[in-house]
Amino acid sequence: MYWSPNVDTSSAPVAPYWPGASYVDVVGVDCYPTSSPLPSSAFASCYSNFYKTYSAAYDIPFAIGETGYAGSSGNAAWVSQLVNQDMCEYPNYIAASWFEYDKEANFLIVEGSSSILSSAQQLLLHNTKTGCGSGETSLGDLFGE
C-alpha cells in the first residue's frame, strides 16, 4: 500500500492514521511550498520530519505524493530541489508526483510556459545523483536520453 496523507502539521497530525509498517510498502506526503523567493531549505522543510518518522524509521521507500510551486521564483527552482536531493540524507527517496493543474495557483509545467517545461526536462533528464557509495546515474541515462 502507498500511504500518502495530504499534509502533516501540528494542527493536522497524521500519526493517528498511520496503519503500521507491516501494511505500508511506500510512504509519501503532499507539500506545496509558498515562500517567495523559494529558500534552498524548502525540500527539508516540507519533507524531512515526515521522512525521518515514516520512511527512515521503518526503512520504507519515500515518494512525494503531490507537489507544485507557483511562487514568483518559478517552478524550475522547486523542480531543481526535487531532483537534486542528497541521496545520503534521503536514501529511500524514489519518486515525486507533480500537480499539473491551474487551480488556486498556476502549477503547470507541461502545459505552461515552454521555458519552464524545457528547464524541468533538462533537470529531470540530465540531473546526476550521487548516492552514498554508489556511482553517478542521471534519469536521462535510465531513459536513454
Where are each of the predicted segments found?
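A structural signal for short, well-ordered beta-strand segments and their strand-loop junctions
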Residues: M1-S4, I64
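Short secondary-structure transition/capping segments
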Residues: S4, P39-T53, K103-S118
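Alpha-helical scaffolding within the catalytic cores
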Residues: P5-P19, S41-Y54, A77-D86
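Active-site-proximal loop/turn and secondary-structure-junction residues that shape catalytic pockets
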Residues: P5-T9, P33, G68-Y69, D102
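Short, Lys/Arg-enriched charge-dense amphipathic segments
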Residues: W18-P33, S115-K129
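Glycoside hydrolase catalytic-domain groove-lining segments
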Residues: S22-S73
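Substrate-binding cleft of secreted/luminal carbohydrate-active enzymes
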Residues: I60-E145
